[in-house]
């Protein structure tokens, strides 16, 4: 059972961020906790991926604070940040630097000063968790999309971070691979990890403990999926992709809609012109 009286794993407090004159994040405040599976959703350009870059220290907030287990993120505590946060991207190819999968996982452990035996034990353990034991001697770039994502997950697990971010990590996968990764997110939450998924995937959202809805850089709704997505009409108001919204509403609450195809196209056009 999630206990939100404890210290937040990650906390945004009044955060602002912009590129030049274009504000991407506006007065953003929220907390996420260990043992919590959180989905961040919103239309393209709503600020979702900017959140992951701020969390991982790739971007610096221009106002407000971001804390990881109570410690404010800054350029002076990058090591602390890397010890607590892992991220799996949409396309993990750029993360692969080893000749084999085993080499790739081992690379991230080199700064930990483990013995060779300890490192081997960790690699074998995370490979088993991610279901890639038979891939350890393969070349990462020759694997399928789903296999690459599982290798990326194993590499993150080897470092044992408390917070794991999935940034659109299932969007390019086939249905079977998607199911595998989504189930893994749930398992990680059950192990006590704080799992943050930036996604458009309906099934991911319905399995989350909490959903954050972003719109034009603002957090406009948050809560349990059944509370946030309580009607098709509400979903349309917050400028999420409408086909996604309608199917999600039906999935979560059994909501149906009589909107026809032409109305749908017109509605999408009006929303995206705003």
From Swiss-Prot:
Entry-linked Gene3D superfamilies: P-loop containing nucleotide triphosphate hydrolases
Name of encoding gene: ecfA1
Membrane topology (UniProt): Peripheral membrane protein
Protein task: ATP-binding (A) component of a common energy-coupling factor (ECF) ABC-transporter complex. Unlike classic ABC transporters this ECF transporter provides the energy necessary to transport a number of different substrates.
Protein family (similarity comment): Belongs to the ABC transporter superfamily. Energy-coupling factor EcfA family.
EC number(s) stated in the UniProt entry for this protein: 7.-.-.-
EC main group: translocase
Taxonomic source organism: Mycoplasma pneumoniae (strain ATCC 29342 / M129 / Subtype 1)
Keyword ATP-binding: yes
Compartment(s): Cell membrane
Name of this protein: Energy-coupling factor transporter ATP-binding protein EcfA1
Keyword annotations from UniProtKB, A to Z: ATP-binding, Cell membrane, Membrane, Nucleotide-binding, Translocase, Transport
């Amino acid at each position: 059972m999630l206990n939100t009286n404890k210290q937040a794993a990650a906390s945004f407090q009044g955060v602002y961020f912009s590129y030049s004159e274009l504000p991407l994040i506006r007065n953003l405040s929220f907390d996420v906790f260990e043992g919590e599976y959180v989905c961040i959703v919103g239309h393209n350009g709503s600020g979702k991926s900017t959140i992951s870059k701020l969390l991982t220290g790739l971007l610096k907030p221009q106002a407000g604070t971001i804390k990881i287990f109570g410690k404010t993120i800054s350029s002076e505590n990058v090591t602390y940040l890397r010890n607590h946060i892992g991220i799996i991207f949409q396309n993990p190819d750029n993360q692969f630097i080893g000749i084999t999968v085993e080499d790739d996982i081992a690379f991230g452990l080199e700064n930990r000063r483990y013995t060779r035996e300890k490192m081997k034990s960790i690699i074998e353990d995370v490979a088993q968790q991610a279901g890639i034991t038979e891939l350890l001697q393969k070349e990462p770039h020759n694997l399928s999309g789903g296999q690459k994502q599982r290798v990326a997950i194993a590499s993150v697990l080897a470092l044992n971070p408390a917070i794991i971010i999935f940034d659109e990590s299932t969007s390019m996968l086939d249905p079977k691979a998607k199911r595998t990764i989504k189930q893994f997110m749930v398992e990680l939450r059950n192990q006590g990890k704080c799992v943050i998924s930036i996604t458009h995937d309906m099934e991911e959202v319905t399995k989350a403990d909490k959903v954050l809805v972003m719109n034009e850089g603002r957090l406009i709704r948050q809560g349990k999926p059944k509370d946030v997505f309580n009607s098709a009409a509400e979903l349309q108001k917050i400028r999420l992709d409408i086909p996604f919204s309608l199917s999600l509403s039906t999935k979560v609450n059994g909501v149906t809609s009589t909107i026809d195809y032409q109305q749908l196209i017109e509605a999408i056009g009006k929303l995206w012109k705003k």
